[in-house]
Amino acid sequence: MSRSAAASGGPRRPDQHLSPAPCGASGPPETFRTESDGAGTMNKLRQSLRRRKPAYVPEASRPHQWQADEDAVRKGTCSFPVRYLGHVEVEESRGMHVCEDAVKKLKAMGRKSVKSVLWVSADGLRVVDDKTKDLLVDQTIEKVSFCAPDRNLDKAFSYICRDGTTRRWICHCFLALKDSGERLSHAVGCAFAACLERKQRREKECGVTAAFDASRTSFAREGSFRLSGGGRPAEREAGDKKKAEAAAAPAVAPGPAQPGHVSPTPATTSPGEKGEAGTPVAAGTTAAAIPRRHAPLEQLVRQGSFRGFPALSQKNSPFKRQLSLRLNELPSTLQRRTDFQVKGTVPEMEPPGTGDSDGINALCTQISSSFASAGAPASGPPPATTGTSAWGEPSVPAAAAFQPGHKRTPSEAERWLEEVSQVAKAQQQQQQQQQQQQQQQATSVPPMPTMAPTLQPFSAPVGPFDTAAAQVAVFLPPTHMQPPFVPAYPGLGYPPMPRVPVVGITPSQMVANAFCSAAQLQPQPATLLGKAGAFPPPAAPSAPGGQARPRPNGAPWPPEPAPAPAPELDPFEAQWAALEGKPAVEKPSNPFSGDLQKTFEIEL
């Protein structure tokens, strides 16, 4: 009843309260019902006042809007604002389903897309970050194998390309912001067409043909696409005009140029004109081909180099590399090989003052020249005993071998051995003369144990004197001299032993013979002294005036411990003379072989 009174709007007592609606009452209160009806009425009113959207027309139904995109692609000014979703590897090189699966996979990854700008041109596709202006993707158009819009998302677009480094198929996906995926796909198709037209034009100009073999799924290309000029028509026409003007204009005679160099182009010309004017057009290229641009010749000419030390490049420079595992390529080895090929006498060492000398080459020169220079003392008269130096003085021929200005005969090993053989023959002749003189003196002098004045003209006595042992001690090589120097001088009192023929042996065998002869010279004085001990000791020699007999050069004779007997026919000397008189028999050249014949034998 209160409900009816309240609804009727009559007066209400203060103690009167509104009771809630029973639970079983259906529907909201009347006030709520009235508000809902008013809201619905207002929504209908608003919808009636709004403009209706035009009916959706797909992109394929309005191709007139894409004509501007084709021109922009050829000019390189076509761009679209997109969101770059990223790239993912795919298994196939083409197919719309492959692109759609790649878009789904990238969206499922939850990666944040990058707001960027897609530039489409006949050269390639470039994606530039809109905020940082970084180049995200730079794709050559020839590497793109497939592009398509997404059938599930109107603004999705993706393309498949071959990765240049890993050789895998990669799918790049985009979401267009203002345009649809179909428009982006159409622009990329225009880029394909422009690239194909450019390639066909190059094939026609360069004469390139490609033969495709279906059985081998390969093609063979003949010719080259490498043009040396720009690919745009404007550049080609400009190049044709320049060539026509250059052919029509008379050629100006250039000034005198340096030999081996083309006259440089003036610096006022542009780099393009330099390359076109300075480089001749090849006969095989067509008239439309522009020659490749090169650097000007004045930049390619060597300006100079620092050559402050010309002595370092000489043959005997001490700064050359001497240590190498390849011994045949060492500078010192090459120098020794080439020195034998030079005709005439070449000084091995430069005169003092230049300062350029090679220690290794000098040492080798001294060793080799010691054998070659041995013929100089043999040509003169045999040195007499009276001309020998004092006991403490060094020998003159030994010092002459170390002169820095000596010269070596630059010949082959055969010529070197021939000179050594001549020296040996000269020594043999000298020894024969000495033996003849000894025989004459032995027959004319009576066998008295006293020393007679007739012993002075002896050139090289072979008898068992103590002075002979002293002479050997004088000519023994010092510590600083190499042993090969000992047999090179004919002034020795004893011939070099063993006398092995030197013709036809190698230089190493010659050095070995020299060492053997130097080693066998030393035990002879002791042997001869032992032989001399068999004679009775004679009285001390005295001069007629009772004074010591002076030497012809003014120096006094050294004190002799025991007088030596007069030279007489000793069995050892007779055997030695018999061996010297025999002709030289050909013996094996190797001193280390076991079949050497016995020349002499010493009994102790």
UniProtKB/Swiss-Prot annotation:
Segments of skewed composition (Basic and acidic residues): 233-245, 409-418
Modified residues (Phosphothreonine): 279
Ranges where the record places region Disordered: 1-68, 223-283, 372-457, 531-604
Bias (Low complexity) ranges: 246-260, 427-441, 542-552
Tissue note: Preferentially expressed in the nervous system. In the developing neocortex, expressed in postmitotic neurons in the cortical plate but not in progenitors within the ventricular zone.
Limits of the PID domain: 74-225
Example of a GO cellular component annotation carried by this entry: cytoplasm
Subcellular location: Cytoplasm
Domain characteristics, as noted in the entry: The PTB domain is necessary for the inhibition of MAP3K7IP2-mediated activation of NF-kappa-B.
Subunit-structure text: Interacts (via PTB domain) with MAP3K7IP2 (via C-terminal). Interacts (via C-terminal) with TRAF6 (via TRAF domains). Associates with EPS15 and NOTCH1.
Protein's job: Plays a role in the process of neurogenesis. Required throughout embryonic neurogenesis to maintain neural progenitor cells, also called radial glial cells (RGCs), by allowing their daughter cells to choose progenitor over neuronal cell fate. Not required for the proliferation of neural progenitor cells before the onset of embryonic neurogenesis. Also required postnatally in the subventricular zone (SVZ) neurogenesis by regulating SVZ neuroblasts survival and ependymal wall integrity. Negative regulator of NF-kappa-B signaling pathway.
Entry protein name: Numb-like protein
Organism: Mus musculus (Mouse)
